[in-house]
Amino acid sequence: MFGSLFKKKDTQRHPSAVPKEGNQSLSTTEAAALTKKVAALTTQIEQITDDKNKRHLLYNQLGATQVKLGNDLEAIAAYEASVKDKEEFGDAYNALLNLYETQRKQAAKAKNDDDIQKWVTKTDALLDMSKRVMRSGFGY
């Protein structure tokens, strides 16, 4: 009677490793183009001193480009600068959560307790920022 409701889980349906978007190997021309884009974005950011919204968007682009190049630490620096300019949910927030988790996992593999604590602390600070954003949106 209930045979059709309870099915066995198919273990073959779930792949063991899901390829990540940023870990694809880039050709030399793609890498060179992305490196040029990083240089151009960095120059634009240095020239903008008063418009935080525009600088925020440029930092987001810089972070995304650094992720494509596989430069996680540089991407983290760009996204942190973006969040510093404008605290909001969005690309920078989501990317930082993912990058912090990746760095924490690498530190755990290397059994480096100091780095694990560093990335956990950064994640906690980002979550605290999300609470501030939520509260500011509702007038608390």
Model feature map: region roles:
Residues 48-51, 85, 133:
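Structural marker of alpha-solenoid helical repeat scaffolds
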